[in-house]
Amino acid sequence: MNEDETSILNKKMEKIEVEMAEFERLGAEREKEAVERIVQEENQNPEVPSNDDASTDIKSRKEGNMKVTAEEIGLETENFDELPVSNGFGVSRRETHYGNNRTYYKNSQGYRRKPKRDDYNNNRKNFYPPIQNSTYFINATGGIDSMPYFGLNNAPGNIYPFSMYKPLEADPQYLSVPSSMPSRREAGMAYGYQNYKRGGYTPNTQYFEEPLNNTSFPNSQGKEGKNSGYRKSSRILDIRVKFGNSSMKAINFQPKKKIVHVVHNPRLHQNKVLRVSIPGSQPALVTPKHKMNVPPMGMYPLPFSPLPSAAPPIPFSPNVSSHPHMAFLPATVPTHSAPPGFVPYDFPITNDKMYPSPSFQEEFPSTSKSPSATPGSSNAPVVDMHPSADSATYPTSIYPSNVRARDDSQQAYISANMTTGEMPSMTNVPAGNAPAAPGTMYTTPLPTANSPIAYQSYSVMPTYWSFPQNYDSTVPAVYPYMPPPFSGSDMNVMSNPAADTLRSYSPASQVSTPPFGFVYYYDPNQYYVPVSNESANATSQPLSNLDTGGSAPYDHI
């Protein structure tokens, strides 16, 4: 490139720079002018005229044969809908008339219209109450007595479930319970026309009507419309319902039609077929209940802190009674020893027949054979342990520590078979872990400061959540998928660590309680599995969706 070409290029660049500077200067001037014009327009009428002043001004200008605009006529007339007003583009524009203190809108044709009531966007009082007005937490003032009874499969401590008690007043978005953080309502045709061609959610409801054969009605003999001999109380509708928005339908009975009513909702996964018996020709209100009123996983009401990051979210399990057992493990041994089966806690009464819990506190007379009843004896509860070979004399407890280790000679049982009120002799305790001779009775050592007692003589409800070995939220924890009452690796009051020889265990650490007052032990064996040697971390890998490391097989939970 010679000098001439270089000079030409430099001149072109200088010219471009000058033009760009001029362009920027003009743009800044225009922006400044626009701002000044807006400020000037806003400052033209600093004082709002009253009705009388404006009307007088219009009358004087009428007498002077001056031009009067339609907007000014609007100050003294009420027939706003007849006044065509346009802003020049036919676009809806908002005006505020100070005379009557009302706001009017202009539609696309330029006519004024009255504003719509914003019932479905702002005024939601008839859908669900404000969250801050709800006091149905389990740890509210009054404790359990202030908590309503929710039924068998409903997690206690939730916010008032409108869909259960007042289904017609409940927001259809919240089938079980409203969360403490209200999400955006689904836009549907019921909330106005704002979703027109905007991809708003509209449930696809399809009706399939299949004519029935007349021979299916006894004694009908082909008579049209006459169902003689057919009992009105046994008309059957096949109604396939997907729970969700618009799943509550009033279905008019049609005598000769088989109505298959399908409601598709992409937000839900349950699909249940209901056979509804129609007692007559009256409409049937089909209100399917949610399978279980399950709170959203990981989203608990605000007063509770989130779960520890090491443990997975805990779903509501039907293995646990519908009432929370306030059976927090005592920090110290109780001052009295209780007979077998006695639970020193006031448990609420539950109607759960499948998983019953102690519902009353028994009173024992002073002639009890418990160690504390004998003067001079220690108040420390004592549990004798005997080998399972003598199970005929000492039957096993209801919940052995490990159901697969039932024949293990090291198995410890919970029943306290105290035959006298005195402390048993400590001389026949076998050395080490050797089993005792059949028929002999030996006890745990007396508690010391460094060695607290291992087994209390009262039974405590399970203090862990019985998950499968590898927790998977997609597997329901109900029969036949129920885990055994005590997993082989748990470490609670009723487990014998020496008896579990099937696999090694790590000591369970008590973590903070999840919502609704349950105490559980976090056992890493229930949530961790070994990782293959090819992995960078060859020790263990958490199976928790709260794990920030991203355990691949369980990211979908």
Swiss-Prot record:
GO terms for cellular component: cytoplasm; nucleus
Region Disordered, residue ranges: 39-62, 101-127, 356-402, 536-557
Residue ranges the record marks as coiled coil: 2-45
Keywords (A to Z) from UniProt: Coiled coil, Cytoplasm, Nucleus
Biased composition (Polar residues): 101-110, 358-380, 390-400, 536-548
Top-level taxonomic group: Eukaryota
Compartments it resides in: Cytoplasm; Nucleus
Key word Nucleotide-binding present: no
Protein name from the UniProt record: Uncharacterized protein C622.15c
Organism of origin: Schizosaccharomyces pombe (strain 972 / ATCC 24843) (Fission yeast)
Lineage: Eukaryota, Fungi, Dikarya, Ascomycota, Taphrinomycotina
